[in-house]
Amino acid sequence: MLITNPALLGILASLVPLALGAPNQPIQARSRKCVIPSSYASSHGTADDSPAVASAFAQCAENSVIVFQEGVDYNIFHPIKATNLSNVEIRVLGNLHLPQDITAVQNIVKSGQSTWFTFQGPRVDWTGADDIKNGWINSYGQAWWDANPANSSSFPNRPHLMSYKTSQASIKNFRSRKPIAWNVKLQGDDITVSHAIVDATSTGGFPFNTDGFDVEGTNISITDSVMFNGDDAIAVNTPSHNIVFARNTIGYQSHGMSIGSLGKDPTDFANITNLRFEDVTVIDALYAARFKSWSGGRGLVKNVVWKNIRTFNVTFPIFVTQSYSDQSASRPGTIDPFSSVMMEDFTWSDFSGTINTYHPGDGSCVTDPCWYNVGLPNLKHTEAIVLECNTESSCKNFRTEGIRLHPQSKDSPSVICMKATAELNPKLGFECKNGTFVPH
């Protein structure tokens, strides 16, 4: 159960642990403990421990501690669903293993069980092992990525790893190795996530849709974590307010720190305020800071800051599109091309590092042109900033400052800017036109 990726090992070694607890401590003591037995060793890794796990969550659903034993392996061959939890700590000191039989997992997903772990209730804490060798969820996603058909971005019947809906809770030392696809859908209020690791690095096929945390809620922070994956490290969805993403390292073929996508369904009004992404290192990613909404969407995203972002070999360090496209998606209803999810009070401050000039893009491209190049005129891959506003009134109070991003080719950094008018964006920091980036 060792991490073998050299880059990931180096980053883990460089992190300084900063413990964060839950915002509010439970009122009642967790007086009951359920220690989950394992048949992994006695069966030489063939037995299914899912029934024992499900039994523990049923017996200790309230005011309890549920323990996966230290250094012990568990086969979780069937989904675990515990939606009646209250004031429970899930203590993951061992290692969990999903099935390696792709067809068996697909059949489970086809039956309607699309998420492998579902936890719901107030004050549900996840505490992983301090020892880096333990506390891992092993999903064996490499075989799925390698089996993905050529020129396809969507292998059928892939499970989501985890749905976690709680309040006044903490998630510490969450560790996911080779997730099949999406990692954690995190919903709720007053949640701290710290010291998480997502390792979706691949030795073969591209790890499509291996999002780190898809977030929806209020007062949520994700800090001191490492995510190497093939999609968003964090994607903030609506409705969300007061979200912090800080002191993290993200990369591999990451799609960065994202808001959205928003507005795909024009009847779903976007409502997002007060987001802060700060002190983040981004390595070998497609994007660093990204906003994505569909033309025809509706709603408002306000008061967003990306600050002190370090990029190494990133294709699009700062990227905004209000005309997002998805190569595998269709849209409901009638679309008004002049309607937009409005953006207001956005700041990009103190970005430094390199732009991927020589080998831009990533392995998610299955179309020609690549989905991430659609609508971008005369790309040079020297672009420090791309701002695609849908209309002349859909972007307001944009500010850039301290942008020190340099193409690997040593050419001057450039910018693509559409419809971010000087009247609505007096502190934009450069002239909104396509060409060389000249900060004011």
Swiss-Prot record:
Cellular component, GO annotation: extracellular region
Residue spans of the PbH1 repeats: 188-210, 217-238, 240-261, 272-293
Gene3D superfamilies, per database record: Single-stranded right-handed beta-helix, Pectin lyase-like
InterPro entries: Glyco_hydro_28, Pectin_lyas_fold, Pectin_lyase_fold/virulence
A GO molecular-function annotation: galacturan 1,4-alpha-galacturonidase activity
Intrachain disulfide bonds: 389-395
Active site residues according to the UniProt entry: 231, 255
Catalytic activity: [(1->4)-alpha-D-galacturonosyl](n) + H2O = alpha-D-galacturonate + [(1->4)-alpha-D-galacturonosyl](n-1)
Compartment(s): Secreted
Pfam families on file: Glyco_hydro_28 (PF00295)
Enzyme Commission number, as recorded: 3.2.1.67
Record's signal peptide: 1-21
Segments passing through the bilayer: none
Keyword entries, A-Z: Cell wall biogenesis/degradation, Disulfide bond, Glycoprotein, Glycosidase, Hydrolase, Repeat, Secreted, Signal
GO biological process terms on file: cell wall organization; pectin catabolic process
Residues carrying a glycan: 84, 151, 219, 271, 313, 434
Main function: Specific in hydrolyzing the terminal glycosidic bond of polygalacturonic acid and oligogalacturonates.
Family: Belongs to the glycosyl hydrolase 28 family.
Name of the protein this chain belongs to: Probable exopolygalacturonase C
Source organism of this protein record: Aspergillus fumigatus (strain CBS 144.89 / FGSC A1163 / CEA10) (Neosartorya fumigata)
